[in-house]
């Protein structure tokens, strides 16, 4: 359902966001979005933009409203991203107190200790704007004090890969654990967040593509080598690729690959990747991750289909790595043709 009264902007169009806030006329601004949508990044940029215009801004995060029961509820729901783990009523009560009495005591939650460790005392309400960063849910109490509600949106496959990359870098979790967690998070996101877009006053779209920052660019160059010219075979893998269409043209195809060392052997590993053609059918930018637990295949397929990506087909290829002196060559064979993978920084 489309709300014709909503404002729209991209994450880089801060002037449009500021104009919408000014026109709405509210002191209270809610910022929400799915996991890895960059809502925290946007919230920080919005605070900086308002401050640069001379406004005084108070920032409140729903992360500080996890409670001492969070660990118990985590065991119940299986994820920290479930909205029932956050004390939204307590947060709304503090917002009411701030606007009605001009002062409030705000909790400070420690993720390390997993408890509220202190309080921030606001004794005088001398702020022009109050920014509240939420998870992704709509609370029926939000209409109090005429809030301006901003939702940070993005393509679903982009959210998945940002989270996969971010969590591996941030907490060094195994890939299969991250995917298992996302398999719990995205159904919640569809129920509590995605289905309630029409309730937001403004949609801010994050069109950042992770391939631009993290992707490897390469060309598949058609070749006609004799096997004897390639040197010594180092590794050969037989690959079945399952393709999922992107939700937006040009944003990239998601590929889940079965990898076999023996053509008729057992599944050796699984690769999940996101790739995009760079205007040329043989030029690609790709980000990929591999895990050597075969059962991971079912988990990643379940995640992608739960998230709503459309399965579009299957392809087969053989990938071989040869070494000839100091030179290492990767050859991909598909449908009887051979292609050499040439990294962009190797090309003259």
List where the protein language model places each region.
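ATP-dependent NMP and nucleoside kinases share a basic, alpha-helical "lid"
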Residues: 117-167
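Extreme N-terminal, non-catalytic leader segments
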Residues: 1-30
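Small-molecule kinase domains that catalyze NTP-dependent phosphoryl transfer to phosphate-bearing small molecules
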Residues: 139, 169-214
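Conserved nucleotide-sensing/catalytic segment adjacent to the nucleotide-binding pocket
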Residues: 58-61, 67-115, 129
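The conserved Walker
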Residues: 35
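Conserved lysine of the Walker
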Residues: 39
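Hydrophobic positions on the alpha1 helix immediately C-terminal to the Walker A/P-loop
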Residues: 42, 46
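N-terminal strand-loop-strand beta-hairpin
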Residues: 216-324
């Amino acid at each position: 359902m489309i709300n014709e009264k909503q404002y729209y902007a991209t994450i880089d169009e801060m002037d449009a966001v500021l104009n919408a806030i000014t026109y709405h006329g509210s002191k209270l601004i809610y910022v929400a979005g799915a996991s890895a949508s960059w809502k925290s990044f946007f919230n920080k940029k919005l605070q900086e933009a308002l401050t640069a215009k001379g406004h005084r801004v108070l920032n409140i995060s729903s992360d500080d409203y996890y409670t001492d029961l969070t660990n118990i509820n985590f065991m119940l729901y299986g994820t920290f991203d479930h909205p029932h783990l956050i004390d939204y009523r307590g947060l709304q009560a503090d917002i009411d107190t701030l606007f009605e009495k001009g002062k409030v005591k705000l909790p400070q939650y420690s993720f390390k200790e997993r408890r509220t460790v202190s309080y921030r005392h606001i004794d005088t309400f001398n702020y022009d704007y109050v920014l509240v960063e939420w998870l992704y849910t709509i609370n029926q109490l939000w209409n109090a004090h005429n809030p301006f509600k901003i939702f940070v949106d993005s393509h679903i496959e982009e959210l998945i890969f940002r989270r996969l990359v971010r969590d591996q870098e941030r907490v060094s979790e195994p890939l299969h654990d991250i995917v298992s967690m996302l398999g719990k998070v995205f159904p919640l996101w569809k129920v509590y967040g995605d289905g309630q877009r029409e309730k937001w006053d403004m949609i801010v779209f994050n069109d950042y593509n992770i391939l631009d920052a993290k992707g490897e660019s390469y060309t598949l160059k058609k070749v006609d080598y004799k096997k004897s010219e390639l040197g010594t075979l180092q590794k050969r893998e037989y690959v079945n690729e399952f393709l999922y269409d992107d939700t937006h043209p040009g944003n990239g195809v998601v590929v889940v690959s079965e990898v076999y060392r023996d053509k008729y052997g057992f599944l050796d590993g699984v690769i999940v990747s996101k790739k995009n053609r760079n205007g040329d059918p043989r030029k690609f930018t790709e980000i990929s991750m591999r895990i050597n637990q075969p059962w991971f295949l079912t988990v990643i397929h379940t995640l992608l289909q739960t998230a709503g990506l459309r399965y579009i087909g299957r392809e087969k290829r053989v990938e071989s790595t040869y070494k000839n002196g100091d030179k290492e060559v990767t050859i991909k064979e598909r449908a009887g043709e051979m292609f050499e993978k040439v990294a962009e920084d190797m090309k003259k």
